[in-house]
Amino acid sequence: DLEADLEKYQASIQNRPLHSIFIGGGTPSLFSAESIKLLLAEIQRRIPFSENIEITMEANPGTVEAERFKGYVDAGVTRISMGIQSFNDDKLQRLGRIHNAAEAKSAVSLAKVSGLKSFNLDLMHGLPNQTLEEALDDLRQAIELAPPHLSWYQLTIEPNTMFAYRPPTLPDDDALWDIFEQGHQLLTEAGYQQYETSAYAKPGFQCQHNLNYWRFGDYLAIGCGAHGKLTFLDGDILRFSKTKHPKGYLRGEYLYEEKNVEKNDRAFEFFMNRFRLLEAVPKQEFEYYTGLSQSAVKNQIDFAIQQNYIVETLDFWQITEHGKLFLNELLALFLDE
């Protein structure tokens, strides 16, 4: 089914090479290495791989064994992303995770000797009843394991989840700010560079898949619940998502919805993505990815500069610290009235 789903896009991508593959959504590490190898071979048979393709697979620390990791590397996986979330067993239980802190550390040890080019640890802060010291202790333990990449997210309560029905006591805004400020300092001192709102990496280890997404690049969506974006030769931009129901997917009902990104919405969508990254925004990329000229946003840009939301050079726009604090107001400037 994944192969048939992929086949539908072959004509649309005009033989463009793949620069990254992200195998996520649940626990793909339950797949055998043989299955992953087969999947990647089928993708490569249809779409060329770039020379330094990054192939990331999500893994649950509770489902990892040494042989499996080595098998994934042999199959072509270059990077593993592990959903650690916390090193505090009480907090992990509260989050409904199936692993404990000892298993998480064991999984990291295996990742280090498996031949992977890189690996990421997903960590959360702002957990129920979490103190500043507990949050920083999680970070210290993560830093000690020396992952090349760390994703450090604040817990958000999603609708229709256990926490949405029975809201826990979460740290207040002041406590969250202290956690972020002191945590950011810990990470920086340990040699990690923040390159996106929630992502830190050692130099040269940024996640290419992340970068492409936040730079408003294209990505295919293959499999249940996947979301994608494609730009066509005529300049049209299509966003699409796949059915969330495995039964429907197995019946060949792949597509859930698709919509064209109208020209009026492109500036907003572009900046909403780009301003998540800390790097400067090349003006040429605005034109390349949106198909719009810079003059289309001149008034909004001038106002944003006046408000100290961004600074401008001949070739770049850069969001300021002030702009990050007022991101919603900055983005609202680009909304189509």
Protein language model features and the residues they cover:
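C-terminal scaffold of the Radical SAM
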Residues: 1-11, 16-292
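Short, amphipathic alpha-helical interaction segments positioned at domain boundaries
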Residues: 322-337
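Short amphipathic alpha-helical interaction segments
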Residues: 291-305
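Minor-groove-contacting beta-hairpin "wing" of winged helix-turn-helix DNA-binding domains
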Residues: 316-321
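A short, conserved structural fragment
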Residues: 305-315
